[in-house]
Amino acid sequence: MLDWRAPISSVYYENSTGPCSYTVSSEGTFSIDLKRKRTYEIENDHLRDFFDSDVVANDELLTKYLAKNKKAVLGEIIATIQQEQNLIIRRSPKTNLIVQGVAGSGKTTVAMHRISYILYNYEEDFRPEDFYIIGSNRILLNYITSVLPELDVYGIRQMTMEQLFIRLLYEDWDEEKYMVHTIDRADEKNSIKGGSGWFFDLENFCRTYEAEQIPREPVRLEKTGTLLLDAEYIDNYCREQSTLSMEGKMCMLNEILLAKFENEVSGKEVTFPAREKKALKRKYEKYFGDGKWRGSIFDLYLQFLEQQEEKGKAVEVPENSFDVYDLAALAYLYKRIKENDPVREASHVVIDEAQDFGMMAYQVLH
């Protein structure tokens, strides 16, 4: 008896009879000669039928099965997995994957089987808490989480896209003060907020704001005039450290400047009195800021919207009530400006009904 997720089980789903192979991670590829493929139909502990096939697909069984059982549970669907579905399920979890298909083609089912497969075969890399399932409504999410145990999957977190972005705002979100409203997709202004162009505008806004907040002038040591940091170094550092927030860059630049200062005043001919040295050290410790940005993400977002209006891209200004794209923008501002101690979130996100969300949401998640 073999688990359907085991590497050798791919032989059943992917191959016709005859010479074929399967691959086991870290052990290599094994060649075999597949003599027979047989599928059994068992109902109430009785063998009802069986099918021999020398082709890959299980179309005959699938058609018969779905015709008599419109409410199939996931554990029973395993027997009817098709070759293309199997390839999706078993694809490496290291890359992004988009599954496209008509309504009712099994996209959600394949996604759930894929989670089960990854947890089984990559147990050293992934745990249930590494997964988020994102859906457009709670009804669908509740269904997904209720049936995942049939695939031996437990502890997967699920939430709407709005809830995900709120989660990424951490302590800045006050549920007693702020509300969430459903986006009106028929409103043309909302389609503007959901596009890539809107994200690029927000990205440029953050870049400009950061340049205004972090001093770019050369830093020279008082008394000697020795150059500690030049403008080019500061500019290059801010550009290269793209994963750090503005607050994080300020903290790191302070540390770099302080190290340069300590190196310069140690063992040099020009000596500094202890009091003067202490005062300079205190100054350079906070030269780029005291390590805590004290602005408001929400005020900054309103500032961005005002700039957009000046460019002829006016949208409704939220008054403590936000739609999914407002929340996406707020989460991005938090990440770019304020985040200084990143919290480990999911490493694998499954988004159901992905077409319901504009590129703004995906650009922010990326």
Go through each PLM region and give its residues:
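Hydrophobic anchor at the beta1->P-loop junction of P-loop NTPases
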Residues: V99-G101
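Alpha-helical nucleic-acid-binding subdomain
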Residues: L119-V349, Q355-V364
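Pre-Walker A adenine-sensing motif
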Residues: A79-R91, R336
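Walker A (P-loop) phosphate-binding loop of P-loop NTPases
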Residues: G104
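N-terminal accessory nucleic-acid engagement/regulatory domains that precede
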Residues: M1-K64
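Conserved lysine of the Walker
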Residues: K107-T108
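Pre-Walker A (Motif I) flank of P-loop NTPase domains
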Residues: P93-L97
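Post-Walker A alpha-helix
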Residues: A111-M112
